[in-house]
Design a protein with these regions (language model features):
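Acetyl-CoA-dependent GNAT
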Residues: 3, 12-16, 23-79, 85, ...
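Conserved acetyl-CoA-binding loop-helix of GNAT-fold acetyltransferases
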Residues: 89, 95-108, 135
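Conserved active-site alpha-helix within GNAT-family acetyltransferase domains
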Residues: 100, 112, 124-142
């Protein structure tokens, strides 16, 4: 499945990629989310019939990734939808087309599977990510995300 273009090779992720994903994420967020990445990769690779998570390499070095999943019928949606959970690009490789290459491959793969929509969420203050996704064709979805804070219950 490896596909090379403009010096970027896009391939399927493996469990061995987890430590590198954690380091990239930590460089971006300042947090260590080892358990999250290990769990996410394990579910994507071992518990799913279809793997849609991809990695991008430059000179054999993993410099970016997209992690996602397919959902069938959640939240009253009759058709399948792909969810983009994470897009990572090593800060040292930012603005070199890594994210674009990953999304281009991901969307092509999803279309081949008959998936018509890819959805993600962006924090309101992640302006760079929002602009990047807008440039890639993402638009606000006709959905309202609701949240209930589960702090201490009143007595």
């Amino acid at each position: 499945m490896d596909e090379e273009r403009d010096g970027v090779t896009v391939r399927l992720l493996t469990l061995a990629d987890a430590p590198r994903l954690v380091r990239m994420d930590q460089a971006i967020t300042g947090r260590n989310r080892t358990a999250w990445y290990e769990g996410k990769l394990k579910r994507a690779l071992e518990e799913s019939d279809l793997q849609i998570s991809l990695g991008a390499q430059v000179d054999g070095f993993l410099v970016g990734a997209v992690l996602g999943s397919l959902h069938y019928g959640e939240f009253g949606q009759p058709e399948p939808i792909a969810i983009l959970d994470t897009i990572l690009v090593d800060p040292g490789f930012a603005r070199r087309g890594i994210g674009s290459a990953l999304l281009e491959n991901l969307t092509r793969n999803l279309r081949a599977l008959g998936i018509e929509r890819l959805r993600t969420e962006v924090s309101w203050d992640e302006h760079d990510l929002g602009r990047f996704l807008g440039f890639q064709g993402f638009v606000p979805a006709p959905r309202l995300v609701l949240e209930l804070r589960l702090g201490a219950l009143p007595a």
